[in-house]
Amino acid sequence: MSPPVAPPGWSRWLVPPAALSVHLSIGQAYAWSVFKPPLESALGLSGTQSALPFQLGIVMLGLSAAFGGTLVERKGPRWAMTVALVCFSSGFLLSALGASLEQYWLIVFGYGFVGGIGLGIGYISPVSTLIKWFPDRPGMATGIAIMGFGGGALIASPWSAQMLESFGGDSSGIALAFLVHGLSYAVFMLLGVLLVRVPPRERSVEGGPSVLAGPQVSADRAIRTPQFWCLWIVLCMNVTAGIGILEKAAPMITDFFADTSTPVSVTAAAGFVALLSAANMAGRIGWSSTSDLIGRKNIYRVYLGVGALMYALIALFGDSSKPLFVLCALVILSFYGGGFATVPAYLKDLFGTYQVGAIHGRLLTAWSTAGVLGPLIVNWIADRQEEAGRHGASLYGLSFVIMIGLLVVGFVANELVRPVDPRHHVPAPKEAAHVERQQSESA
């Protein structure tokens, strides 16, 4: 399947809807916490066990993005979106089978492993294409697409909760909900497959700079630079801090206010998940667009510095005020989403657009690491605290202190980012081909 090149006159504004159709679908991953309570009840799982499909999905997202990034660059976004469609939908179908048979390992394999591959390939598939279509506004462009990933749970959370209420929270009801998800997302993602196009190579797009303007760094050279690894740490720390809340959002707010006169209902908890998704989505377009104005390093200073302050406020005062808890969580999740949306533009600023998709894919191994660290820290500590007889907000106090420390580490790593040494730059593809041709002729 060759990359579909846009014909003359093709509007670049048709590409973001194609990206959104994929990212809104795979963004369902952020609504996994809605399935945790019924799975724990139906299959007798602990909080740590019920997080496994989500954790494995994030691990596979990073690994498939890292190993598939170069392939996606070569084969193009339509091929990648097709692979994502097949894997993501198949993951739900396998999970439906696992739930109906009450075989939890099959849910972990289907949603986590197979679906996780779809997450990774689907996540990176439109990003480099959008950067090439919008070289003049890379932060806004990637924010539009990645906004969909953050907003997917805004749709999926109440939708999933309604299905579980209608179908029932037992294993058969969960299986039917998984089945409906898989089939519905397959249809929606197909729209993106049919619509996506790539810009003509090395041509300016609507008066902007050339698609390959400026210094370029290959993916192989990029991972040898300190800038890549500083950004890896920045992304890992920011994601760990956000994903720790997001993965356990519904039970967390219920636990936090369980001992108050106005406990949080299941419906309200699902609404909280939807609010977090809205903040996640808004942060992806809002903060990433802001980065086009104030710069990538400055916006990450906000994400990491203010994020640490928000965690401190929750740890100190969160259980005394629902509005404060919700507000701080929303700010943290907006920074979490903004961090994802801004990092492709940060990579473009440092390494150019030549292989930015492949570089982005390799950087997403930081997400894989964070996908294990965040839920593990929050769930494991909460389980141990519960075993010790503690309850309510005390289940999460130590976790939040750890998150503050991780954000400080990320802040320091961001301060260490500097422009890439010119020795890592490579010739643009045309120039490189000309040099190789001269060398072969002289030989």
Task: Go through the PLM ranges and name each one.
Residues 149-198:
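Helix-loop-helix hairpin linking two adjacent transmembrane segments in secondary transporters
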Residues 137-158, 361-375:
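Glycine-rich segments within core transmembrane alpha-helices of 12-TM secondary carriers
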Residues 32-37, 157, 220-288, 371-378:
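Extracytoplasmic gate region of multi-pass secondary transporters
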Residues 39, 120-134, 141-142, 338-351:
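Intracellular juxtamembrane helix-capping segments at the cytosolic ends
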Residues 64-77, 283-296, 382:
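Helix-to-loop junctions at the C-terminal end of transmembrane segments
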Residues 86-100, 306-319:
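C-terminal ends and interior cores of transmembrane alpha-helices
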Residues 182-209, 410-418:
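C-terminal membrane-cytosol helix-exit motif in multi-pass small-molecule transporters
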Residues 235-244, 267-343:
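C-terminal transmembrane helical hairpin of 12-TM major facilitator-type secondary transporters
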